[in-house]
Amino acid sequence: EQNLVRLEHDARALSTYASVSIEGNPLPLTDVKSVLKNRPNNIRDTQREILNYNQALEEISQKVKTGDFQLTDDLIARIQGVVVNDLMEDEEDIGKYRKKPVIIRNPEKIDEIAFLPPDAKEIVSLMSSLVKFINSNIGLIDPIILAAIFHKQNVIIHPFMDGNGRTTRLLTTALLGINGIDLFEIFSFENYYNQNVTKYFNKVGVFGDYYEIKDDIDFTDWIEYFMEGILDELKRIQKTI
């Protein structure tokens, strides 16, 4: 039991570290563990990101454990609100779907636009359709494939001004959890993505204008990569037990 507690503690720290690192947070894992342990009062944004993500992770984990998790628009917005709390200037962007356009830049060539997501006026409709699709297919579509579909589609819709990736990764873990693959305690698939961030972005992202490519987006490559990530992480855990 002590070993399981240690694994759970380590997995949460690793998930938090990896997910914020993917988005550019420079703090090493040792610093992340220190922030989570000591919870300092006067903190920088890089530390705030860590505490926010960990809080959201704990909230979602608790919902899954108690059987209280259900994917809804309100929950998605709530989780984003926790993730970006005190990190955004405009309160309208916290815990609410975006009402402004966004552009996704190529992380390797920052002056190059990689993707133009859907118009803000369509976000509510697109997210409603995604939530309905996921909930209506629980038990019908393989849970790993269903979680992978949610992950990529939510990234494509890009419903928030900021915090999309972190929110998506948290909810993906929860979707796996309610479908019998409860990974919170020992598992961090974010760790797999963080080992090669460029590959993750290339697999989960799409390139171009949403309205020009939306009918031709292929999820197959991403789903295969997603499954490889779960397998890779399970192998890592096996070595630590």
Label every model-predicted segment.
Residues E1-I241:
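FIC/Doc superfamily catalytic core
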